[in-house]
């Protein structure tokens, strides 16, 4: 059975896509810890990030770096930098969380999630896209 992320890759369900290339996809988390919280995934469904082959794992991190730099530019003045987390429990599809942060407590997955309207999420995704350099 396909993960929810594979369904996003296949455009079976909608997402607020920030960037993609032939192997990787970045889209906004719909239950974000912060404004511009973005998920970066390989298009190939692999449950555990460290089960990716070396080339795919390296490519995922290089792609994530480009997205993080775009988030940094988009969030300038609202966050100090983009934090990174790999948890791997909530969806059985390898993914990296990119979370704009001001301090370490901003990346606490136990805290309540933020809520944004569809229009706000679309505007955030479009704002980040302007800074993506693939």
Regions from the PLM with identified roles:
Residues 1-134:
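HIT superfamily nucleotide-processing domains
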